[in-house]
């Protein structure tokens, strides 16, 4: 089992002009969502970006899922 970095995502002006990247890589998080949006399987993303582990990608997707649910709950409560 891979130990995931903390935090999962790094934002620094030193890397990709401050775009969120997978911590420990120079891979933009947006690339993962671009693949998903295009209907490409996670395995294809992982093959194209071998510096990102499956566990790391899934953890970022889970983070996004939790954020979406939290946002939807706030909107529903209004």
Residue ranges, per PLM feature:
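Long, charge-rich, low-complexity alpha-helical segments
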Residues: 27-78
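A short, structured beta-strand/loop element
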Residues: 2-43
